[in-house]
UniProtKB/Swiss-Prot annotation:
Major localization listed first in the record, in broad terms: plastid
Cellular localization per UniProt: Plastid, Chloroplast
InterPro entries associated with the record: Ribosomal_uS15, Ribosomal_uS15_bac-type, uS15_NS1_RNA-bd_sf
Subunit structure as annotated in this protein's UniProt entry: Part of the 30S ribosomal subunit.
Organism: Sorghum bicolor
Record-given protein name: Small ribosomal subunit protein uS15c
Top-level division of the source organism's lineage: Eukaryota
Encoding gene per record: rps15-A
Length: 78
């Protein structure tokens, strides 16, 4: 459901958060197998920061869209 509606506007905050979430999950599973891959761990931390900043922006601008997005993507709220 999220994919279909987000492919229309790749610049939207929701699509960017969705994309970062997929990359984060993929990197997290990679790091479970390769615990000493520190460059990937650094990349994961960068992605987490970018996603966190986008979510903070969305929460400030439109709380309803923010709540809907974190529930769809199963992300914890800070």
């Amino acid at each position: 459901m999220v994919k279909e509606e987000k492919q229309e506007n790749r610049g939207s905050v929701e699509f960017q958060v969705f994309s970062f979430t997929n990359k984060i999950r993929r990197l997290a599973s990679h790091l479970e197998l390769h615990k000493k891959d520190f460059s990937s761990e650094r990349g994961l931390r960068r992605l987490l920061g970018k996603r966190q900043r986008l979510l903070a922006y969305l929460a400030k601008k439109n709380r309803v869209r923010y709540k809907k997005l974190i529930s769809q993507l199963d992300i914890r709220e800070k």
